[in-house]
Amino acid sequence: MVLSEVWTALSGLSGVCLACSLLSAAVVLRWTRSQTARGAVTRARQKQRAGLETMDKAVQRFRLQNPDLDSEALLALPLLQLVQKLQSGELSPEAVLFTYLGKAWEVNKGTNCVTSYLTDCETQLSQAPRQGLLYGVPVSLKECFSYKGHASTLGLSLNEGVTSESDCVVVQVLKLQGAVPFVHTNVPQSMLSYDCSNPLFGQTMNPWKPSKSPGGSSGGEGALIGSGGSPLGLGTDIGGSIRFPSAFCGICGLKPTGNRLSKSGLKSCVYGQTAVQLSVGPMARDVDSLALCMKALLCEDLFRLDSTIPPLPFREEIYRSSRPLRVGYYETDNYTMPTPAMRRAVMETKQSLEAAGHTLVPFLPNNIPYALEVLSAGGLFSDGGCSFLQNFKGDFVDPCLGDLVLVLKLPRWFKKLLSFLLKPLFPRLAAFLNSMCPRSAEKLWELQHEIEMYRQSVIAQWKAMNLDVVLTPMLGPALDLNTPGRATGAISYTVLYNCLDFPAGVVPVTTVTAEDDAQMEHYKGYFGDMWDNILKKGMKKGIGLPVAVQCVALPWQEELCLRFMREVERLMTPEKRPS
């Protein structure tokens, strides 16, 4: 009776009024959310500009007081020499900090890599412990590293203005080791992209060529360090986010085993996903700098502040070892066709290693498509992207994430249908779509078990060949801006080692030649799908851009991985600075 009366009331004029009211409310709500997002963009950019102005004024004051300082000579010092001069007193921490502040301000004009000036770095100079391994060293931080009094926005409007109440654990340890964190650097919106753009701070450009992406998600770090604006930085990696920007910007980067360094206090857009491991790692111009950073972080303070981290100090004797290595290698994973420059980089490195007395044997991890399409994609999106999408309510979606957000918003039944229809023509896309559907707790446990079984199978395969380390291609050269988000399959060389949770680092070994670039006309890819076509187009016009190789070791063998990287660096040593 009540329902019929309600229906009668709604069927008349009042029903029309109610419908109009609901529609109006929806429009107003949408407009309000849009205005909120616009306000966040305005505030974020105002703060960014204000911070950069404060940086510049501080630098100008210092230069007026120290007109005879040779900034170029200081900036040219490798990190180990810089540390020696700081600890001996030959250089003051003030001279080093303000010189790098000036360089960071300068290179930011062409790259847009700095999001926030960590203003207390000036007062911290007097507080830094002299005995620390990183005494007086300026360190840049990917924006997700929580820093007291500053926001870690991840390029999302809901995080704008939400300042951290304390430093994350690794930042605390850096300070205890005498380092001076001085800037936050840009990331792609949500950090789930290997490009580097977001609505709050805009696009970061590659220092070697502004029309190219710096990589992501630690793209601001790659651009800043690659252009000489920071001697050392920290990034994170869940699919290649340290390795892409390091490779694209011509620097070195290490993704350690997931739990070797603390993640406590890091900002994320998705919490609780553990199937595919996130790693914290260093980025720098040379491998010795990475090793010094790892040695500094793997100390008693880290193990005290985060008891979930295994108390494994850095093993210097492994890093300094000179025994010949038995190296597995592959030219291709048969999933993403290597560009001519990628293939040449691996083969030239192989030949140099053999000439230096190391043993190189062919090796390819088993069942790579399964690891990528089922395990990695399924692990990252076991909830169908639900947690991820919560971050975008009322926010703008950056173009670098447009395709991903669109796919994740599709209902489960439609993803399944689309996957079925696409499978005959585009099997890779179909497989990824299928894996991005939400799954039950039972299915998630099954997936996690499959990941562990796959990991053990690759370790067994590795040990059966008695390998020390593995040499692989690394995607390169840098792609055009706004291209990485439309070439998802190209993460195959990196995300495999997140799925396996093996330490992996990249070292630049060559640059793209005119012949490499010309041969890209014949590049087809293995599948001929849209990912292959976009990749081909996005990697053209790369003459002179850096190309890296990837060095991999078994879990918890970061020192051996770095030792291998240092050997590759010693043998190859290309020009590392953008011209």
Curated annotation (Swiss-Prot):
Inhibited the trifluoromethyl compound PF-3845. The active site is at K142, S217, S241. GO terms for biological process: fatty acid catabolic process; monoacylglycerol catabolic process; positive regulation of vasoconstriction; regulation of trans-synaptic signaling by endocannabinoid, modulating synaptic transmission. The chain crosses the membrane at residues 9-29. Residues 30-403, 434-579 are cytoplasmic. GO terms for cellular component: endoplasmic reticulum membrane; glutamatergic synapse; Golgi membrane; organelle membrane; postsynapse; presynapse. Substrate binds at M191, S217, I238, G239, G240, S241. Its EC number is 3.5.1.99, 3.1.1.-. It is found in: Endoplasmic reticulum membrane; Golgi apparatus membrane. It catalyses: N-(5Z,8Z,11Z,14Z-eicosatetraenoyl)-ethanolamine + H2O = ethanolamine + (5Z,8Z,11Z,14Z)-eicosatetraenoate; (9Z)-octadecenamide + H2O = (9Z)-octadecenoate + NH4(+); 2-(5Z,8Z,11Z,14Z-eicosatetraenoyl)-glycerol + H2O = glycerol + (5Z,8Z,11Z,14Z)-eicosatetraenoate + H(+); N-(9Z-hexadecenoyl) ethanolamine + H2O = (9Z)-hexadecenoate + ethanolamine. Homodimer. Belongs to the amidase family. PANTHER family: FATTY ACID AMIDE HYDROLASE (PTHR45847), FATTY-ACID AMIDE HYDROLASE 1 (PTHR45847:SF3). This is Fatty-acid amide hydrolase 1. It comes from Mus musculus (Mouse).
